[in-house]
Amino acid sequence: AALDKGYHLVLEKPISPLLDECLALQKKAHEANRVVVVCHVLRYTKFYGTLYELLRGGAIGRIESLDAVENVAYWHYAHSYVRGNWHKTADSSPMILAKSCHDMDIIRWLMGVPCESVSSYGSLDWFRAENAPDGSADRCLSGCACKEGCPYDAEKIYIFNDKSGIRSGNDEWPCSVLVNKPTEEKLYDALRTGPYGRCVYRCDNDVVDHQVVSMRFAGGATATFTMSAFTAKCYRSIKVMGTMGEIEGDMDANVLYLRKFGQPEQVLDLGTIPDRFAGHGGGDALMMDYVCELIAAGGAEGLTSVDASAESHVM
């Protein structure tokens, strides 16, 4: 309807959990001659942008294999995919689409050629009722005898955690998902009565807590992707192996390591990300700047146009 009225679109990912709808929107965008940009924001970051330029410039020769890991972090997974908005596939989408379509998009972009085959394994192994420890309760603040030793305890995550807790000065995400304008008092009220105070072993979640994807691309290059809830830190890491060298990267540190065979390692420190650019390694703000410039210039093809994003959704 928006395209019919002549609007340009900026779409949150995924485009749709249904392939037919993704392809229909792609077709409609062409018919309407409108800009449709999907929020695959990682393409706009300095980290992945620099990596892309190195690969396209032949820094490590021909790409033969790529390994990418999304370290979700135990507390982030518990917040979003056990207690939170994306805990049920039927109400949102599968984990690989809800969380990791960013990664599928980046892998396809970096490889530079179409993906020809995909296989995947994953399951929900840990956040299940049978794994609830003896003495646990339905809610973390309802007399749970296991609170002290449980890293998934809601009070730890939203009150005390040095990254996510309000006592560390964080009054934004994830605390702001529980209540508007978070305070410690308001958060405790939400934990006593709302979904984010539930025991992680007694929720109605059904999305996988770990998954591995193997891909084969045109020309024979291969890639693997691992998504895991069971990590201490929340960040992405990557290693690309080519015929003349390798590149390894840590997005949290914003550093790339270029190792050309037979030569000294080059450390590419991409610098500290300013607060304004903090979301997704700077990608959120940079994408919106890019979209405004794209529309002002009358362009139809962007880094994450619907055409560029459709194939990664198919993957």
What kind of region is each of these model predictions?
Residues 6, 82-91, 268-273:
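Short glycine/proline- and charge-enriched loop/turn segments
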